[in-house]
């Protein structure tokens, strides 16, 4: 009797197993069955899993978070604000030069201050023209390079903010301390003695000529502390080197020679005191390096007791411009316009291969 009952129980279990097998076929059995028919392929396994999952959804779907946020948003409207900021300080500088010019003492009454560089190097008349030409060449190179940058909006707002801040500092220094002319060769324009209309004309003349001697617009005196020419020569070189490929060493060397020669020619021409050039170089390089260190380091973007850089007066402005920029800007170029054919477009060159693979994965998804 025990044998008969055991046989019945095994038959009952076998029938239940067959019924469940008829309703659901495991992927492994499907593969084995198709292997017998000579059609076993890796593709059948994935199909079996897919069909089984759809028919019997006894699983938990875990949705992975997709980081769809752009780590380098362009935000051109912020670039426009930075441009207005730089333009305002540039106009303010011309106004301040016009005001300070009225306070410059005559060179007959207040001779030039002693300067060690002038004691050892005689004045060369054409040297200042070389300095201004070098500055225009560097500005042209930087403008061309900036137009081909992929993230030109982020780089542009950095340039405009730093340039505007430097000229704001220059307005303050030249206003609080008026130095006598650095050489007896200076031919300053006559004082206007309160003629507002003539002062406005001088401001417009300075703006139209860029404040350059070779354009005939540099006729006012008093803007000696600190040198605006040194600011332009230094800042353009720093941006050219920072946002160009590292293996363009020859390009960096040429730009460095143009910048260094231009700064030396300012002193050789006796157009600025040596202290003017030193202060301009120091303030320009410090502000550039501080800003980019804070922009590239996430921890320095947060105001805290240990972050002493956040105590700068311009930190709120910096945070407004850089709060959505995650990480450093890759050296990536693109055609500035969308109309040229594809043969003229070059692929972006990045230093990080991992970043390139990440962007390819984002495009595929």
UniProtKB/Swiss-Prot annotation:
Q: What is its EC number?
A: 2.7.8.27
Q: Give the main localization category.
A: membrane
Output the InterPro entries linked to this UniProt entry.
Answer: Sphingomyelin_synth-like, Sphingomyelin_synth-like_dom
Q: Where in the cell is it found?
A: Cell membrane; Golgi apparatus membrane
Transmembrane regions: 80-100, 128-148, 159-179, 219-239, 248-268, 273-290
How would you classify this enzyme at the top EC level?
transferase
Q: Spell out the residue ranges making up region: Disordered.
A: 9-50
Q: Source organism's superkingdom?
A: Eukaryota
Q: Which reaction does it catalyse?
A: an N-acylsphing-4-enine + a 1,2-diacyl-sn-glycero-3-phosphocholine = a sphingomyelin + a 1,2-diacyl-sn-glycerol; an N-acylsphinganine + a 1,2-diacyl-sn-glycero-3-phosphocholine = an N-acylsphinganine-1-phosphocholine + a 1,2-diacyl-sn-glycerol; an N-acyl-(4R)-4-hydroxysphinganine + a 1,2-diacyl-sn-glycero-3-phosphocholine = an N-acyl-(4R)-4-hydroxysphinganine-phosphocholine + a 1,2-diacyl-sn-glycerol; an N-acylsphing-4-enine + a 1,2-diacyl-sn-glycero-3-phosphoethanolamine = an N-acylsphing-4-enine 1-phosphoethanolamine + a 1,2-diacyl-sn-glycerol
In its UniProt record, a GO molecular function of this protein is: sphingomyelin synthase activity
Lipid-modified sites (S-palmitoyl cysteine): 331-332, 343, 348
Fill in the PTM field for this protein.
Answer: Palmitoylated on Cys-331, Cys-332, Cys-343 and Cys-348; which plays an important role in plasma membrane localization.
Q: Name one Pfam family in it.
A: PAP2_C
Tissue-level expression reads: Expression restricted to late round spermatids and elongating spermatids but not detected in late elongate spermatids and Sertoli cells (at protein level).
* GO terms (BP aspect): ceramide biosynthetic process; ceramide phosphoethanolamine biosynthetic process; regulation of bone mineralization; sphingomyelin biosynthetic process
Job description of the protein: Sphingomyelin synthase that primarily contributes to sphingomyelin synthesis and homeostasis at the plasma membrane. Catalyzes the reversible transfer of phosphocholine moiety in sphingomyelin biosynthesis: in the forward reaction transfers phosphocholine head group of phosphatidylcholine (PC) on to ceramide (CER) to form ceramide phosphocholine (sphingomyelin, SM) and diacylglycerol (DAG) as by-product, and in the reverse reaction transfers phosphocholine from SM to DAG to form PC and CER. The direction of the reaction appears to depend on the levels of CER and DAG in the plasma membrane.
Pathway membership: Sphingolipid metabolism
Q: What is this protein called?
A: Phosphatidylcholine:ceramide cholinephosphotransferase 2
Feature: compositional bias, Low complexity = 15-28
The species this protein was found in: Rattus norvegicus (Rat)
Active site residues of this protein: 229, 272, 276
């Amino acid at each position: 009797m025990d044998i008969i009952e055991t046989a019945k129980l095994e038959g009952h279990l076998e029938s239940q197993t067959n019924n469940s097998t008829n309703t659901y076929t495991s992927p492994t059995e499907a593969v084995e069955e198709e292997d017998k028919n000579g059609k076993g392929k890796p593709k059948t396994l994935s199909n079996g899993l897919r069909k089984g999952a759809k028919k019997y959804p006894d699983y938990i779907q875990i949705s992975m978070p997709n980081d769809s946020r752009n780590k380098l948003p362009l935000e051109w409207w912020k670039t426009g604000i930075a441009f207005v900021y730089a333009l305002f300080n540039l106009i303010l500088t011309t106004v301040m030069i016009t005001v300070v010019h009225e306070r410059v003492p005559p060179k007959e009454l207040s001779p030039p201050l002693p300067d060690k560089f002038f004691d050892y190097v005689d004045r060369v008349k054409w040297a200042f023209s070389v300095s201004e030409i070098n500055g225009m060449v560097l500005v042209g190179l930087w403008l061309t390079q900036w137009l081909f940058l992929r993230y030109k909006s982020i780089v542009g707002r950095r340039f405009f903010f730093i340039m505007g801040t430097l000229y704001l500092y220059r307005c303050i220094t030249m206003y609080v301390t008026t130095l006598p002319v650095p050489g007896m060769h200076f031919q300053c324009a006559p004082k206007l003695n309160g003629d507002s209309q003539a002062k406005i004309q001088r401001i417009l003349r300075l703006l139209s000529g860029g404040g350059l001697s070779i354009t005939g617009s540099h006729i006012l005196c008093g803007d000696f502390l600190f040198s605006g020419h040194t600011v332009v020569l230094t800042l353009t070189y720093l941006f050219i080197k920072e946002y160009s490929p590292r293996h363009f060493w020859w390009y960096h060397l040429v730009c460095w020679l143009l910048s260094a020669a231009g700064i030396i020619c300012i002193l050789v021409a006796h157009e600025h005191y040596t202290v003017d050039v030193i202060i301009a170089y120091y303030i320009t390089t410090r502000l550039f390096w501080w800003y980019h260190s804070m922009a590239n380091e996430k921890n320095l973007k947060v105001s805290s007791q240990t972050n002493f850089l956040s105590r700068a007066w311009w930190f709120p402005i910096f945070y407004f411009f850089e709060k959505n920029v995650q990480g450093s800007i890759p050296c990536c170029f693109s055609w500035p316009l969308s109309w040229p054919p594809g043969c003229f477009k070059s692929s972006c060159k990045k230093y990080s291969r991992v970043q390139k693979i990440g962007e390819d994965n984002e495009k595929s998804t």
